Amino acid sequence: MKALNHFVVRVDKAFNDTMEVGDKSIYLDSKWNEFENRICYGVIESPPTRHNTGAKKGDTLFFHHHVTTTDNLRIYDNLYVASYGGWKPHAIAYRRKKDGKIVMLGNWIFVEPTEVDKTDQVTESGIVMQLGHNVKDRDVAKVIVPTDYMKEQGVNSGDVVGFTADADYKMTLDDGSVVYRMIEDNIMYVEEK
């Protein structure tokens, strides 16, 4: 199969629908915690031949969660189409098979949450205010992989950025690591060092 403008990816399992408890497997309804249990990656069967993405057959594509849940994006069996280019593309990034490097596509970026230590405080009257520990700060994140455009603007991996509310979406990658994806337009500022 030869894709022209889109990626064709093989996704063997669209949901994490099993859970191991001891020596037993529990099967989960895919609608339970649906967003948390979607698998948003697959093996590239064909990169788009009309675009020079650098991706190769066998690399791993990370994509928008709609790819495996939208009927018209399924070709057959476990093959799906992930759009590339245009407005709001499905293809987010790919991991090169040869060296494991993640390459961002379009205007998507990966970030990780910054941890905010909100230690308990004691008021003058002795009341302990439990604020919790290591709570994710929802509007600030550390850039993992910036786009080329962001690099041109001086934004690099490790920089802390502020972003618009609810712009980040949690994704679990093929190696089990958790990232948040967003579009570079959602970045409002870069903290100065």
Annotate the PLM regions:
Residues 1-193:
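Acidic-enriched and Gly/Ser
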